[in-house]
């Protein structure tokens, strides 16, 4: 059930919560009719990120920071995962709402799932592995702080060792899935040849060979074979964001993530990112008002909170961008993959918009702000008319014109 005031769910509702999709409504101009109607948007696909790591590294602290959940709601003493929906802070959307007053602000969202205890124990027992496989990416919390009361995993502080230990268990988990499937495939192929099964068999053998060399699948150039194995949702294929949890004395070391990435050899690894936070400091920050929080951050030489840093790093890792729509009733931020077209964006808002797509009217956020109004942007020629193949850029404001 929902934990009051926290926006999180416990494991009893997790399976249901993961299938819930946000619904939205927009006023839309019907091309050629002069009418405006209220239509439901398509189901909003929210990015899902699973928080994993060893025990006593600060996973739940990070979850509380991101979701503004309170400790009492999580301290059930039971091995439950918790889910929280986080609004993605975006100053550009805030500015649009000021330009178009009276409209509701609808931020893009990210779901975070906090897995209980050590991820190694979860993988070995199979508990909640299925829910982890449904994530778009993993946020692996790595301990980089000393605490006399809570000893570090393995008895000594060694972030790189902890990364390697978790990676190995993830690889073994994927290998177990592959070996089980290969046994079934080989039995079926002995009975009858099947091109699709043969392609799957070959792709799984490629994956198996890489994993046996302890190479995670995210670092393997699978090419067309990646589409063949996508349905297995292999954990080692998922992008991973290493979240370095610093001690209080290191909170101002904003370069810590870059330094650690270089030392651990993570910088050049594909589908891998690093962010640094100080869980203790950020937990204190979450209890303050906006004004006090800004002063508190400044005292540590920080320009932004961990929420902004982790979400930005997650977006970069997943290769997604934001575009905006301004309707009669709301200003909304949408998340879409980098390289997506205007036609893709129309489908993100509503499938009917995609089917009846005529054109997109697009203006850069900066140009719209400089113009001061949509009418002025149009008169200056800043509102561009684009076709369905137009590739969207981060921060563009999009108006979809479509047939009724």
Region roles according to the model:
Residues 7, 16-22:
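N-terminal polybasic/positive-inside topogenic patches
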Residues 41-126, 132-133, 138-140:
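Conserved G1/Walker A P-loop phosphate-binding module
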Residues 2-8:
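Extreme N-terminal basic, low-complexity initiation segments
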Residues 111-114, 119, 125-231, 275:
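Long, charged N-terminal accessory/stalk domains
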Residues 24-45:
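Short, Lys/Arg-enriched N-terminal segments with co-localized hydrophobic residues
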Residues 69, 92-93, 116-119, 143-149, ...:
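Conserved nucleotide-binding/hydrolysis micro-motifs of P-loop NTPases
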Residues 40, 44-63, 184-404:
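C-terminal-of-GTPase-core extension/linker across diverse P-loop GTPases
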């Amino acid at each position: 059930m929902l934990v009051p005031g926290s926006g999180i769910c416990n494991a009893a509702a997790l399976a249901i919560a993961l299938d819930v999709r946000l619904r939205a409504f927009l006023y839309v101009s019907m091309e050629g009719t002069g009418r405006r109607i209220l239509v439901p948007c398509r189901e909003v696909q929210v990015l899902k990120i699973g928080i994993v790591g060893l025990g006593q590294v600060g996973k739940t602290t990070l979850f509380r920071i991101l979701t503004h959940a309170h400790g009492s709601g999580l301290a059930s003493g039971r091995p439950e995962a918790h889910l929280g929906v986080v609004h993605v802070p975006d100053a550009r959307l805030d500015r649009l709402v000021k330009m178009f007053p009276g409209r509701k602000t609808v931020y893009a969202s990210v779901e975070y799932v906090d897995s209980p205890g050590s991820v190694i124990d979860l993988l070995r027992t199979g508990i909640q592995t299925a829910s982890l496989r449904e994530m778009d990416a993993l946020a692996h919390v790595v301990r980089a702080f000393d605490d006399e009361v809570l000893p570090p995993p393995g008895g000594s502080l060694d972030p790189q060792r902890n990364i390697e230990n978790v990676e190995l268990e993830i690889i073994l988990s994927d290998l177990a899935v592959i070996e089980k499937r290969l046994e079934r495939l080989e039995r079926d192929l002995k009975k009858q040849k099947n091109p699709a099964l043969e392609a799957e068999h070959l792709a799984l053998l490629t994956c198996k060979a890489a994993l046996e060399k302890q190479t995670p699948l995210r670092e393997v150039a699978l090419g067309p074979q990646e589409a063949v194995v996508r349905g297995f949702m292999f954990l080692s294929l998922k992008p991973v964001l290493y979240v370095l949890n610093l001690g209080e004395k290191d909170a101002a070391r904003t370069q810590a993530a870059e330094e650690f990435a270089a030392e651990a050899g993570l910088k050049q690894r594909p589908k891998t990112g690093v962010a640094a936070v100080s869980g203790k400091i950020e937990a204190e920050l979450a209890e303050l008002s906006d004004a006090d929080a800004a002063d508190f951050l400044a005292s540590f030489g920080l320009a932004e909170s961990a929420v902004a840093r982790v979400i930005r790093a997650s977006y970069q890792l997943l290769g997604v961008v934001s575009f905006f729509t301004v309707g009669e009733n709301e200003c909304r931020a949408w998340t879409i993959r980098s390289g997506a077209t205007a036609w893709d964006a129309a489908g993100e808002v509503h499938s009917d918009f995609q089917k009846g797509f005529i054109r997109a009217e697009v203006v850069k956020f900066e140009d719209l702000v400089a113009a001061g109004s949509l009418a002025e942007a149009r008169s200056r020629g800043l509102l561009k008319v684009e076709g369905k193949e137009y590739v969207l850029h981060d921060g563009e404001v999009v108006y979809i014109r479509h047939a009724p």
